[in-house]
Amino acid sequence: MKKLIFCLILAMLSQTFGSFGQEKTIWKIGENDNSPDKMALAPDQYRQFLASDFGYEDNYFLVGHSKAEKDWPYVLPGPANDWGGTATLSGIRANFLNINFELKQKPSSGNWKFTLDILQTDPVNAPLLQVIMNGKAWKFKLNKGNGSKNPEGDFSNAKEQLISIDVPNDLIRAGNNEIVITVPEGGWLAFDQVKLEGPSETRLDLPKEILLKNITAANYETLLNGKNFQPLLIDLQHIKGSPSIQVKLDGSVILSQKIEQGRYVLEAPMPEVSAEKSSQYEIYLNHQLLRKGEVKRAPKAIKTPADYVNTMLGVAHSRWMIAPGPWMPFGMVKLSPDNQNTGWQAGYDPAFESIGTFSHIHEWTMTGLGTFQRQAR
């Protein structure tokens, strides 16, 4: 009997330790060595953060392509830090660090953990850390640091803080995944390491020429050559080269396009349907199958050119803001010159502020006309 109990305990222990052993580091940025030296701008070039093009919403660190020493800053400023873009004339600036990683294979079950090893924080203004993974957000109020006012010098005696997030398995997906790290309140934080752990069967994919971010059916129809189409929206990011994309719907080619630079949201025209219907799509990169899946189609309302207008687009980093007013029709929208270099920003950041009723007319002046931003149809 004692022998049986001993064997049962041994079996349970082996299963327990075996389950721990099934997790592995999927990817990491930096080393857990209490030093930021292997990251960009380290150890004291924090004032070059904006000039080095860090913090902008459309920049990203792509696992498998980007290099920490060049593409990941050792420090992330908060709105309390003037060197991060916040100033009296320019308003409050939010900075973002985006991580994209693509999974070739995602296990149906398993444990995932995202870890931020924070080496040091602002000793005056404790940062509020926000992490957004595939749309789900977590917030953490960090403690004030024990070092100098600015992130420079020796970090050997730093007050390290470890943030671990148990990520739900259903939040991770095959294909592209995105993590956004920002500090909406408080001051700076310095990184020691950022990493993701997951099941040992997980396989990273390394996109070569494009990053396929998302594929979905549009909730509208467009008019093309007198016919209605419901677009298949293909959100992708150019990486390198001049690759060609081909989209097939139920075996028929509906779009062919060369990808050259930047981010695209392609509208592949799916013929309109009179009732809900499921179809199969295939996406080819340079004539090689990249992704396939099912899309649900349905009748939708027509989208006009005015519906594409976003009156807030770009305002967070524009020198003179949006300029509607009595000197031009209220239904029109005009973006005034973005005449500052990349290390300076002005305008209104929608992460903090909202534009109510005012109008900028010709210059850096607000008037009380009570003009709302809108576009005509």
Listing of model-derived features with the role each one plays in the protein:
Residues 1-4:
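Positively charged n-region of N-terminal signal peptides that target proteins for export
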Residues 7-15:
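Bacterial N-terminal signal peptides
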Residues 22-109, 117-203, 259-271:
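Beta-strand-rich ligand-recognition modules
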Residues 91-101, 107-115, 217-235:
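Contiguous beta-strand segments within globular domains
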Residues 178-182, 247, 276-287:
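Short, aromatic- and glycine-rich surface loops/edge beta-strands on solvent-exposed regions
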Residues 194-226:
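Short, compositionally biased P/S/T/A/G/V-rich stretches that sit at domain boundaries
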Residues 227-231, 238-243, 261-263, 270-284, ...:
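Accessory carbohydrate-recognition regions in carbohydrate-active enzymes
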